[in-house]
């Protein structure tokens, strides 16, 4: 018998962690939110919070043993994963420590997909210094993408059009890299037709479920807008589902995975994977009967998922800060919410820098184009001000 409430520890308390915390609280769980800074979004929902460096193994271990959670849900990449492997013998880690370690570094998940599972990816190579970068760039060809092997939200990513831009791209990737690695990945630029996320849910009963595909656009590797359902042929969707299942089956565990693909014609090209709710999946806050965070919690807790329904054409658009401040204030909610079937979710971040993601607008309509226009209008209505 599954006894509730469960005590859940979130390692990472940003906007996605906040929505996980909300979903957990609605199921009666006790939530402990952890992050490196105070008043992070999920901490505003949680029963308890801890502020510390989660990359520090001894600090992480101390907090885990002090709080003694039933379940640990990593929500960010920058973690002392060796501790999770040790802790996993006593406490459930979602989806598991291996999946967390594999997906926190682009090289590990890319090697798994391409080399072990023989799944089509963009051509890629690695470099640990400028000389290797120059050599591999000539082999892959221009234009190409350069990324840190470990970063989040597209930080440190550059599109390089010729060799004269390599040095600047290298410096940016190293500067924005998380952790101690100076390793970067060079990646073939694919002139794709569409970029999608396939939310893939592994359940404790052994079954895998899929949400309707989500189309999205990025700027410098960072999510800007998404829409659901993305228009795919039946054969392309089937290929994407097969690949997502192969990779997530290899990683194991339970929960929701965000699996990203490039679509070019009938070709499906694996891009990246997150073993947790995905930022592009914020559109499910309006599009589905169960949003991605609720699906994640149900899978984690062993609660049935009878069906996943995508109600109608829906879209999201991020709300970005226009200034740096520690006293966040904004206007425009009245205008943003004057449209039907539209909502705004502000994340409650305690400070902003120019371009920081502070919220998301979501909308639904009869068509994807109409939903995207409504979401765009709502997001543009929010203006940040100095009080």
Curated annotation (Swiss-Prot):
* EC primary class: ligase
Q: What EC number(s) does the entry state? A: 6.3.1.21
Which GO molecular function entries does the Swiss-Prot or TrEMBL record give? ATP binding; magnesium ion binding; phosphoribosylglycinamide formyltransferase 2 activity; phosphoribosylglycinamide formyltransferase activity
Q: In which pathway does it act?
A: Purine metabolism; IMP biosynthesis via de novo pathway; N(2)-formyl-N(1)-(5-phospho-D-ribosyl)glycinamide from N(1)-(5-phospho-D-ribosyl)glycinamide (formate route): step 1/1
Q: Which GO terms describe its biological process?
A: 'de novo' IMP biosynthetic process
What is the annotated quaternary arrangement, including any partners?
Homodimer.
Similarity section: Belongs to the PurK/PurT family.
From the Swiss-Prot or TrEMBL record, give the protein name.
Formate-dependent phosphoribosylglycinamide formyltransferase
**Gene name?**
purT
């Amino acid at each position: 018998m599954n006894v509730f409430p469960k005590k859940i520890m979130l390692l990472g308390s940003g906007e996605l962690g906040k929505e996980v915390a909300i979903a957990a609280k609605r199921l009666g769980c006790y939530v402990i939110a952890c992050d490196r800074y105070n008043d992070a979004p999920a901490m505003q929902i949680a029963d308890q919070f801890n502020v510390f460096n989660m990359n520090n193994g001894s600090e992480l271990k101390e907090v885990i043993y002090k709080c003694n959670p039933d379940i640990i849900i990593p929500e960010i990449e920058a973690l002392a994963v060796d501790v999770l492997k040790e802790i996993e013998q006593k406490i459930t880690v979602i989806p598991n420590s291996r999946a967390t370690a594999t997906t926190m570094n682009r090289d590990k998940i890319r090697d798994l997909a391409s080399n072990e599972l023989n799944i089509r990816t963009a051509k890629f190579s690695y470099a640990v210094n400028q000389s290797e970068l120059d050599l591999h760039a000539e082999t892959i060809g221009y234009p190409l993408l350069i990324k840190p092997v470990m970063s989040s939200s597209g930080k440190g990513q550059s599109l390089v059009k010729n060799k004269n831009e390599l040095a600047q791209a290298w410096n940016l990737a190293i500067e924005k890299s998380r952790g101690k690695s100076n390793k970067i990945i060079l990646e073939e630029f694919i002139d794709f037709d569409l970029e999608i996320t396939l939310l893939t849910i592994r359940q404790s009963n052994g079954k895998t479920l899929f949400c309707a595909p989500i189309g999205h656009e990025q700027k410098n590797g960072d999510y800007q807008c998404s829409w659901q359902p993305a228009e795919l042929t039946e054969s392309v969707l089937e290929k994407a589902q097969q690949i997502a299942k192969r990779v997530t089956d290899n990683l194991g565990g339970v929960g929701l995975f965000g699996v990203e693909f490039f679509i070019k014609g009938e070709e499906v090209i694996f891009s990246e994977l997150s073993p947790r709710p995905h930022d592009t999946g914020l559109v499910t806050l309006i599009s589905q009967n169960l949003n991605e965070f609720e699906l994640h919690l149900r899978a984690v807790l062993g609660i049935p998922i009878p069906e996943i329904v995508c109600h109608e054409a829906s879209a999201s658009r991020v709300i970005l800060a226009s200034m740096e401040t520690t006293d966040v204030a904004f206007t425009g909610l009245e205008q943003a919410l004057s449209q039907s079937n539209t909502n705004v979710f502000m994340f409650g971040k305690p400070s902003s820098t120019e371009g920081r993601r502070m919220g998301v607008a979501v909308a639904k309509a009869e068509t994807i184009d109409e939903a995207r226009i409504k979401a765009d209008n709502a997001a543009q209505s929010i203006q940040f001000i100095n009080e």
